[in-house]
Amino acid sequence: MLQLARFYSLARTKAIHSHGAPFRPEYALKCGLEIHTQLNTKNKLFSQSTNSATSLVDAPNHHTSYYDIALPGTQPVLNLEAILFAMKLSLALGSQVNSISQFDRKHYFYGDQPQGYQLTQHYRPFARGGKINLSKELDDIDESAKEIGILQLQIEQDTGKSHYTETDKDVITLVDLNRSNVPLIELVTKPDFSDIKQVRAFIKKYQNLVRHLHISSGDLETGAMRVDVNLSINEYARVELKNLPNTSSIINAIKYEYQRQVELISVGDTSSLMEPETRGWTGSSTVKLRSKETTIDYRYMPDPELPYINLAPDVISGVRGLMPQLPDDIMRILMKKPYQLSLKDAKILTYNSNQNDMYNHEALRSYYLDTFREFSKLAGERSNAKLPTNWIIHEFLGDLNKLQIPLAKAKEILPPPVFAQFLKLLHEEVISATSGKMLLFHILESFKQSNCQDLSIPDFSKLIEKFELHAINQVDPQELMDLCNDVIAQHTDDTFIRNLVTGKKKSSLKFLIGQGMRRSQGRIKANEFEKKFKEILNIQW
């Protein structure tokens, strides 16, 4: 009987996944998020312990104080840096920062919560309201625009971590309090999400925002950002989803839970959807953790040891005046004249993945903008906006990643005015694009071979002469003809040539031009090859 039940459960899980969980209008999804974000303050929220919650190398209980382990007689001292970080995030979201907020005790007993309560802001949160705007243009959602409202933001302390070790006789619980008392911001959204794309876009945008503001690493994988989902269908009760370690888990859990509830509703088995419940994600399905009947009474009460947070209007306005330009505004500027970047390239300069040691988005954007200005001065009205984009974002970054040279180091030999001179050589066709790639890689490779110690600014003229990289202005007609014929001779497939000549596959011409450029080592320009190939093959289109 037990085996039969397991078989049925497994079959049902596979069936739900096979449906792909499409969202149907008759089963309207209503979804909201609760996001806990660890703040990367220097110290913890109520003690002088170093804040190193996401470090993977620290010994257990290394970053702890008497207060963090709840030694009797110790008292909390509020870290004002956490208040500043919370204010920056609130202002970036357009939230109303409350002039008075307070900390409350949330009582529960657990091994990794030594105080027996958590300090949070239940009655008077730090900020209310606000929103994040999503758009089809920037966020790849289906609607032209979608506003996700924010209910509130509150500051609270994180808990410790429990680690379980199995022995021959028992299971031992080990407690690490390095994370205990690390400052968190809990953000609660309104239930404004109606599909998966919106959820994914919101998480990515919020993640980038906290990184942009330098208040958190925003990493889901290390627990610096943790997301719970509140989900309901039509007017049925809310289900909370927990244990969601990354974006794919969040998306898959929503898909699974949506389809699970749709199946229950469609067969009339809605008794389990009448009361709120909490469910966990196992990696393939959601399982019930607790229902309303087992909901914990946290017995909230104002903390008697901490005074109110009282913020004067000039403090809030002062922080507002120090706020950086926000990512969406930056992207829209970059996508317009004079830069005219694609969305993909604009995101490279605006979104910080937090995973690239060679550069961060702010340093890269600053380098790009400075180089663009210098190049525009040199080239004047004839400047080509695509040159800085293609050569910095694609060629230059590609070389840095390949050679593992940090941008900060590369800037020492190729500062923006020097890189602008390099772009001018390409713009004036002193060297071809192929020669430019060879020259740029040689400069960076030589710098790498010196262990980034040779800070000599490259002399482009000498290097061009040394490697004979000058573009050929007077092309030898016979040499060009021979090169083109050699390239064509390599393609014995008549279909390839026929599709090219008839225009059925015009992209093949670019392939032939690329082959010719390689054979000439970039000395002969692409347009010369294009004209000669069209002449030889009698291409009329």
From Swiss-Prot:
Gene3D superfamilies (UniProt xref): 1.10.10.410
Catalyses which reaction(s): L-glutamyl-tRNA(Gln) + L-glutamine + ATP + H2O = L-glutaminyl-tRNA(Gln) + L-glutamate + ADP + phosphate + H(+)
GO biological process, alphabetically ordered: glutaminyl-tRNAGln biosynthesis via transamidation; mitochondrial translation
Entry coiled-coil feature ranges: none
Record-listed E.C. numbers: 6.3.5.-
Superkingdom, taxonomy of origin: Eukaryota
SMART domains to which the protein is assigned, alphabetical: GatB_Yqey
UniProt keywords, alphabetically: ATP-binding, Ligase, Mitochondrion, Nucleotide-binding, Protein biosynthesis
Subunit: Subunit of the heterotrimeric GatFAB amidotransferase (AdT) complex, composed of A, B and F subunits.
Stated family: Belongs to the GatB/GatE family. GatB subfamily.
More details: This protein may be expected to contain an N-terminal transit peptide but none has been predicted.
Function: Allows the formation of correctly charged Gln-tRNA(Gln) through the transamidation of misacylated Glu-tRNA(Gln) in the mitochondria. The reaction takes place in the presence of glutamine and ATP through an activated gamma-phospho-Glu-tRNA(Gln).
Name of the protein: Glutamyl-tRNA(Gln) amidotransferase subunit B, mitochondrial
